Amino acid sequence: MCGICCVVSLTTQHNPLEENVHKNLKHRGPNCSKDITEEISNCSVLFSAHVLHMRGCLTPQPLQDDTGNMLLWNGEVFGGLKLEQEENDTEVLLHQLSMATSASDIVCLLSQLEGPWAFIYYQKSERCIWFGRDFFGRRSLLWKFNPERASFTLASVASQPADDSQSQWQEVPPGGVYRFDLTDTSLDGTFIFELYPWIFHSDDKPIESPELKCEGLPRCVSVNTNSSGLYLTSPVCPMNTSISSLTTEQNHNASQTSVENLKAFLTNTDKKAMVSALIDVLSEAVRKRVQYLPARDALEVSLNQTKADIAILFSGGIDSMILAALTDRHVPADKPIDLLNVAFKMQEAKMPPKSMKKGKNKKNDCDDADKTQLDQQKFNPFNVPDRITGRAGLQELKNLSPKRQWNFIEINVTQEELVEMRQKRICHLVHPLDTVLDDSLGCAIWFAARGIGVINEAVDEELYISEAKVVLTGIGADEQLAGYSRHRVRYKHSGLEGLVRELAMELGRISSRNLGRDDRIIGDHGKEARFPYLDEDVVSFLNGLPVSEKADLSLPRGVGEKLLLRLAAVELGLGLSALLPKRAMQFGSRIAKLEDNHEKASDKCKRLVTTI
């Protein structure tokens, strides 16, 4: 994980990086920072990088080779490029890029990379800058244009201006990689970018370029598909949109939700094989993400015996439970695993006024008063739904792996702290997104990833701060396996055909809905978000299956949605968590209850406007 930035001024007069942006970048990369300014073809270019050490030896960035090529890399290579355990992927990638003699070589190399990434690469021989994000946009990259100063900026994270109308930051669309020629510029403040799009290559189908959406860009910006016809090969196959006539009628009579009902599906040999294949590909995705970690020195290990290297955003729901069960397979048995469970303080429900009817039994009045007092004593303002399911999930994991130390971290947030940190940090990280949903999820994830909470293993609460640099999240499961309530609504109104169309749109828009924001939020703590459900092999496997094999929304909630994943949970030995219906994080953590109940998720959120 790194914070990377590039400021291109089309004159030799350098435009400095905004101070707040520079500060936010340093939060992402606490281990090493460096700025380099170059004058290139009458342009002034600032390269700024801030490194979080995750792999191999600590490698400062921007990283230059002997010929002047320069790489700013915010990513993890999990496949497609040969790397030894002790090697740093930034060094290996720069070496490979430096050997490229053409645009075709660069595009071919980037097509091979598996894992999340965003990058900026200065190719000195061509006097050009390459930049972009991976196919899903799992790493944040923003851009901002200033035609008056004839400059533009690329950055992992921005800063919200006091006057929201002045903001010009946007997320770089992950529809491909971009090339900017520093020798082909004018002083009138126009910016022309060549696009090398992601395209799925198939021998039996014509290659079609997806439409790139660059909405809201200023008139001075032009993005044109490269004239050479070069493209990056999509790392995943298109979704199987076939409509299967097969149904699971043999299980429809078992309308009650129980683990035994789920086990009945596994009596089908083909279904059981499909579930095993999903477990295998998902387990490998988790393995890649929990084993590529920098080694701690001996002194640090001895002082932090109970500190985990891996943390999981954990609600006790099926997505996070499966990640925890699979992480248990690949983390050494003597290493703890942190389970990050966030709750926002609930207000105690007010008791309705007592009826003053004549002749009411005084004994009953006393009994009611005693019961009310007892209820108030029992009330815990942080016993939100995700806390309750989280504790139940913790018990399942202890039963599954009793020798593992599971650190269930109860992260409790008051409204006062929420208001304070939203203004100080979170509004800048969510930016340029600005909806009520972005606010709710951004705040919930920020506090969860910070990892400051308590562990209630003993009689007394123990303050605990998670130091895990890797944070696993369950993003991608709902989008691929029909986990959202809107999927059930679409199925109800439009049948399986409508559901197939809805899911086909989901992954295409996930980068603009979630991933860049969540990367900025988690990265602010000097930690790295990793998304096993969006591993290229996992997505390709699921895309290859008919939708009817992944979900059956004719079955009840808690069974039909994400059916294949629920069967995997049963196969892994999990219990009632396999039957939990989807509960959105903003509702499960109860952050949504703290705000205006009349707001819609898509409304612009006034709370994200900074007043500091």
Curated annotation (Swiss-Prot):
InterPro entries, A to Z: Asn_synthase, Asn_synthetase_domain, GATase_2_dom, Ntn_hydrolases_N, Rossmann-like_a/b/a_fold
Q: Does the keyword Amino-acid biosynthesis apply?
A: yes
**Domain Asparagine synthetase: residue ranges:** 277-582
* CDD domains, alphabetized: Asn_synthase_B_C, Gn_AT_II_novel
Catalytic residues? 2
| UniProt GO BP | asparagine biosynthetic process
Q: What is this protein called?
A: Asparagine synthetase domain-containing protein 1
Q: Which organism is it from?
A: Danio rerio (Zebrafish)
